[in-house]
């Protein structure tokens, strides 16, 4: 069955935190990172929600609550755990992933390839099926007002129950 998944996440900037997008550590112009219970990788969090949504399995918080077990955990591990969870119930073939990253101060153009490669490796998916685009937000919203980063993710895939 052809299904679509949609994910969204937002994290505020914070001092004394790392800034990670799609497993890539970035230097923010003001030295900020992203606040979060895990490593705060807002890209992987939106991707996880999109995958779960495509499979009708709820949201990231249902599987990875704010507990000691997941405190400061790498979001790439959370993504791997999500794939394992999905693969126990479904055979999934992802057609494509499309992602919008909104931030006034973080330009993703130099790291798009790295994010796509990281995502491709974890999902075992061709890089050509992953599209990323950065937007400034034009002074609107959390990303546009430079309070944090917002990510929207859409996935189209074929899903069959095991």
From Swiss-Prot:
Pfam families associated with the record: YgbB
Disulfide bonds: none
Cofactor stoichiometry and binding remark: Binds 1 divalent metal cation per subunit.
Positions bearing the site annotation: Transition state stabilizer: 37, 136
Keyword Metal-binding set for record: yes
Top-level taxon: Bacteria
Pathway the protein contributes to: Isoprenoid biosynthesis; isopentenyl diphosphate biosynthesis via DXP pathway; isopentenyl diphosphate from 1-deoxy-D-xylulose 5-phosphate: step 4/6
Protein keywords: Isoprene biosynthesis, Lyase, Metal-binding
Entry cofactors: a divalent metal cation
Binding site for a divalent metal cation: 9, 11, 45
Biological processes, Gene Ontology terms: isopentenyl diphosphate biosynthetic process, methylerythritol 4-phosphate pathway; terpenoid biosynthetic process
EC number(s) on file: 4.6.1.12
Positions of 4-CDP-2-C-methyl-D-erythritol 2-phosphate binding: 9-11, 37-38
Catalytic activity: 4-CDP-2-C-methyl-D-erythritol 2-phosphate = 2-C-methyl-D-erythritol 2,4-cyclic diphosphate + CMP
GO molecular function, one term: 2-C-methyl-D-erythritol 2,4-cyclodiphosphate synthase activity
Database matches in InterPro entries: MECDP_synthase, MECDP_synthase_sf
Record PANTHER family: 2-C-METHYL-D-ERYTHRITOL 2,4-CYCLODIPHOSPHATE SYNTHASE, CHLOROPLASTIC (PTHR43181:SF1)
Subunit structure: Homotrimer.
Family to which this protein belongs: Belongs to the IspF family.
Described purpose of this protein according to its UniProt entry: Involved in the biosynthesis of isopentenyl diphosphate (IPP) and dimethylallyl diphosphate (DMAPP), two major building blocks of isoprenoid compounds. Catalyzes the conversion of 4-diphosphocytidyl-2-C-methyl-D-erythritol 2-phosphate (CDP-ME2P) to 2-C-methyl-D-erythritol 2,4-cyclodiphosphate (ME-CPP) with a corresponding release of cytidine 5-monophosphate (CMP).
This protein's name: 2-C-methyl-D-erythritol 2,4-cyclodiphosphate synthase
Species whose genome carries this gene: Petrotoga mobilis (strain DSM 10674 / SJ95)
Name of the encoding gene: ispF
